[in-house]
Curated annotation (Swiss-Prot):
Reactions listed under catalytic activity: 2-(N(omega)-L-arginino)succinate = fumarate + L-arginine
Gene, per the UniProt record: argH
Pathway stated in the Swiss-Prot or TrEMBL entry: Amino-acid biosynthesis; L-arginine biosynthesis; L-arginine from L-ornithine and carbamoyl phosphate: step 3/3
Transmembrane segments: none
NCBIfam families linked to this entry: argH
Species per Swiss-Prot/TrEMBL record: Lawsonia intracellularis (strain PHE/MN1-00)
Primary subcellular site in the record, as a coarse category: cytoplasm
Gene Ontology BP terms: arginine biosynthetic process via ornithine; L-arginine biosynthetic process
Class of the enzyme per the UniProt entry, highest EC level: lyase
HAMAP family, A to Z: Arg_succ_lyase
Entry superkingdom: Bacteria
SUPFAM superfamilies: L-aspartase-like (SSF48557)
Protein name per Swiss-Prot or TrEMBL: Argininosuccinate lyase
Pfam families: ASL_C2, Lyase_1
UniProt-annotated location(s): Cytoplasm
Length: 460
């Protein structure tokens, strides 16, 4: 038999079936059952502490809520679409289990502040998982950097060979990106984990409630300052989705490089078979599908952020039913982020880099040309003059189809008589790396400092 609407006292007609289906949220917001139960238990305890309910009533409520949680987790809970959402389903079931005391749970509370609390707890719980996954991924980048700190490859600008860099420097660049993501998620969580319970529908309540007790019970960082803002605020969802968008953007940049580097024309990286697929017609193919799919999933996360911004655009105070649409963008994004971070961590740990291919690519692009220009400056040329002279020497090497370091001293001196035999030491790629001693540079000492700094931060 269909359940009566808990709000249905002033209505004489039942809700049309298509409307019931159209307006329900139970099909997806039941994901928040644990947060809803935790919030209700804290609320019930507060009502007892304030003398609004008896200790016996509070105990009944708490035991009933525990029973409901067990039913949900054993897949025996009777979800009912006519009860619309997770909140009403749980409250109705509570009354079935413990009788009319269950009807007292909602004292001093509205679904408006209840759903805001549930969603804040859900977002907070899950972005905390993002943070842990990011820390794991950073640790793998740091470990790979240690493994390949003596490996040199072309650094690129405009996707053209530019200067030699340590592979460790390249990998650590991503570690620093994801470190910023950790910081963003942490700072976001400070604003997410603020309790709105006690705001009621929009204007507060006449009951002698204690919002600070509830916040403390739920390990929140504070309580709301304005009841109207508390029930209508979804900035925290937007902020979490922005954090997710930046995380996915960073993942997509690394995915793009894995895709390019795994191309035989580069051959810098060997993708594990477990993270690649083949072709239905071309038996030789090994496609970087995992990286491509992850790169493609960025669009759905960006879309979720834009979705939320649009939902809130021009929305008047306070609660409007539009806000029901705030859940699915975050739910979908949360699934995408957690799966992407998990798969990237496993894939990165299994990847091997081709040192020989990277070494051979250095000579193809005359990546030690900047070293030659700097060398000429030490011989008394202005940088602009050194730049022009180096360009002429590169042209000579191109004409002979050899790397700079294979030119003879006579070849060098035919263009600039200030060049001496010590030029060959300067043109060595390992020397080039070591000479980059500036803060944050690709020099070996800088690499060691970066690794130490990140390791120290990861253990804090």
């Amino acid at each position: 038999m269909p359940k009566k609407k808990l709000w249905g006292g002033r209505f004489h007609e039942k809700t049309a079936s298509p409307v019931e289906q159209y307006t329900q949220s139970i099909s997806y917001d039941k994901k928040m059952y644990a947060q809803d139960i935790a919030g209700s238990k804290a609320h019930a305890s507060m009502l007892g502490r304030q003398g609004i309910l008896t200790s016996e009533e509070v105990l009944l409520l708490l035991n009933g809520l525990d029973s409901i949680q067990k039913e949900i987790e054993t897949d025996t809970f009777p979800w009912k679409i006519e009860l619309e959402d997770v909140h009403m389903n749980i409250e109705s079931r509570l009354t079935d289990l413990i009788g009319t005391v269950g009807e007292k749970l909602h004292t001093g509370r509205s679904r408006n502040d209840q759903v805001a609390l549930d969603f804040r707890l859900f977002v907070s719980d899950n972005i905390s998982l993002w943070k842990r996954q990011l820390l794991e991924l950073i640790g793998i980048f740091v470990a790979k950097a240690e493994e390949y700190k003596d490996t040199i490859l072309p650094g690129f600008t405009h996707l053209q060979p530019a200067q030699p860099v340590s592979l460790a420097q390249h990998l650590l660049a991503y570690a620093w990106m994801f470190k910023r993501d950790v910081q963003r998620v942490y700072e976001c969580n400070q604003r997410v984990r603020v309790s709105p319970l006690g705001a009621a529908a929009l204007s507060g309540t006449t009951y002698n409630i204690d919002p600070f007790f509830i916040a403390n019970e739920l390990h929140m960082y504070g309580v709301f300052d304005n009841s109207m803002d508390a029930v209508s605020d979804r900035d925290f969802v937007i902020e979490a989705l922005f954090c997710a968008s930046v995380i996915m953007m960073h993942l997509s940049r690394f995915c793009e490089e894995l895709i390019i580097w795994s191309n035989p024309a580069f051959g810098f990286v060997q993708l594990p078979d477990a993270y690649a697929t083949g072709s239905s017609i071309m038996p030789q193919k090994k496609n970087p599908d995992v990286a491509e799919i992850m790169r493609g999933k960025v669009g759905r996360v960006y879309g979720a952020l834009y979705n939320m911004l649009t939902i809130l655009k021009a929305l008047p105070l306070t609660y409007n039913r539009d806000l029901q649409e705030d859940k699915e963008p975050f739910f979908d994004t949360n699934t995408t982020i957690q799966s992407s971070l998990s798969i990237m961590a496993d894939m990165l740990a299994a990847i091997t880099f081709n040192k020989n291919k990277m070494a051979s690519a250095l000579s193809d692009g005359y990546l030690n040309a900047t070293e030659l220009a700097d060398y000429l400056v030490t011989k008394g040329l202005s940088f602009r003059e050194a730049h022009h002279t180096t360009g002429s020497i590169v042209a000579l090497a191109e004409q002979q189809k050899i790397p700079l370091e294979e030119l003879s001293l006579q070849d060098f001196q035919s263009i600039c008589d200030k060049i001496e035999s010590d030029v060959f030491h300067v043109l060595d790629y390992h020397v080039s790396i070591e000479r980059r001693k500036s803060t944050g540079g690709t020099g070996y000492h800088s690499i060691e400092k970066q690794i130490e700094k990140l390791k120290s931060w990861l253990t804090q």
